Amino acid sequence: MPTAESTAPRLEYKTFQEAVPEFATSMAAITHALKKSGIEPELRELIKIRASQINGCAFCVQFHLNDARKLNVPAEKLDLLAAWREAGVYSEREAAALEWTEQVTLLAQHHIDDEAFARVRTHFSERELALLTVAISQINAWNRIAAPFRFTPPIPGSPQ
């Protein structure tokens, strides 16, 4: 059972950004490029949430749930994301992206499955797949920063 001490932030998001502004600037540039990439904003948020769920990053899950809600991503897609394979609410393109997200996020546990690559490739051009993979890699990087430092999740209405 977690204690208050075991969930206390080790470093806050704002403090992290102030400590390494060059990193924050670089990540913001990647985010800006991805926003202009043509990959649907709703899909980008779904993959960010899914990778963050897998990596156990509370800050990133909440941050991207907030963004997804602002984009009016249907509630059932957010509610069922952890069980997306069985949910039946995702398009084939979304399902392929979510499967690819899991393949890339869990890279250390297995090699990338050729069949998963073939499935995602039928729904994404070469450029789109490269951009999708950059987006997945970026959120994995953020997860590996935010989770160890226990950034406080940005819960709407909570004092930050």
Residue ranges: model-predicted function:
Residues M1-Q160:
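Hydrophobic alpha-helical segments
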